[in-house]
Every structure is written in C-alpha cells, then in structure tokens.
Amino acid sequence: IGLFMLGSVATGAAILVAATIYGIGKTFFWPTMLAVVSERFPKGGALTLGAVGGIGMLSAGLLGGPGIGYKQDYFTTEVVRQENPAIYQEYVSDNEQGFLFFSKTEGMDGAKVGVLLAKDPSELTPTQARERAALQDASIRGGQTALRWTALVPLTLAVSYLILLFYFRAQGGYRALELEEEAKGTAS
C-alpha cells in the first residue's frame, strides 16, 4: 500500500504518510520471512537464514534496481512520445534497452537531457524551457508509474503470506518445528 501510495502522491505530507506506511510494511517483511524460515527449517540454522537473506538481497539488487529503472525509462518515454512527439524525436536515445524478457524500449538520451537540465533556467530559450518542463514532468510521472507497478511485487508476497496463513490454519494452526531429540534427551 505504501509503495503504491508513493507512486501516487505529490505533496510533502502525503509523501511522509506514504513513506511511513511503506516503512511499517517493510519492517515486518524481513523478520517475518526469517522467522518462518528459522521455525520451519530449524536444521538449516544460520546457513539457511543467510542463504534466504542473501537471495533476497541479490534479487533486490540484480532484479529490483534494473527492473525499476527499465520501467521508469519505459513509462517516461511513453509519456513524452504521446504528449510531445517533437520533444520525443529530439531527445530519444538511439540505443534500445531491454530487461529480462520484457520488450526493448528506447529511453530518453541521458546526455542530451542532462545538458538541458544542467543549464541555468535563466539561460534557456522559451523552447528549451518548455522542453525542460515537459521532460521533468514526464520523468516524475514515469517514476511514479514505475513505483505503482513495482508495488505488485510486495502485493504478491502479501498474497503468498495469506496463502501460508490459510494453509497453517487448515493444519490446525502454526507450529514451529522442533529439532529431534538425541538418544539422551538433548536437543541437537
């Protein structure tokens, strides 16, 4: 909910509320995941916890960052293409970029856009000022749309946790698995 809200709000107070909701949700995700793993697979110990945490962090770094960047480029370019075709033609990149199995997209040329954004607003011609405003607006809207689409990932995880909840209720409730006792009655 918080991530979706971050992609939908524009005022400072609303951003603070959305970030707080996102932070609360994020606070419960990692501990819940690690608690379930440690209680359901106690023999795995620290190695299992480390592997699960490592896979999560690798996924976030190798898939999350580039995936969000791809979506931001895609949606930003679509906004410019639909609303300002002339600006699109001037600032579109010659290189198409893809991500995993998603279609390739032409992002905006970062070098050209960077030169425009680096100029002092008082030095801009009226055309450049209009282009700058359009590109900044498209970038913000593209980033917000990318965040809203990214919210599907934690939504999928939330649904998965609900499925686990129903599964454990059907089994008579959630119980941590105990390590088997050794012959002398001590836990291994």
Describe each region flagged by the PLM.
Residues 1-10:
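C-terminal ends and interior cores of transmembrane alpha-helices
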Residues 2-3, 18-19, 158-161:
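A generic transmembrane-helix signature of 12-TM secondary carrier transporters
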Residues 14-29:
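Hydrophobic core of transmembrane alpha-helices in multi-pass small-molecule transporters
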Residues 20, 24, 51-54, 151, ...:
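Residue-level signature of the transmembrane alpha-helical core
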Residues 28-41, 48:
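Intracellular juxtamembrane helix-capping segments at the cytosolic ends
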Residues 44-76:
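A late C-terminal transmembrane helix in Major Facilitator Superfamily
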Residues 66-148, 188:
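Low-complexity, proline/glycine-enriched hydrophobic segments characteristic of transmembrane helices
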Residues 84-86, 144-166:
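Symmetry-related core transmembrane helices of the 12-TM Major Facilitator Superfamily/SLC fold
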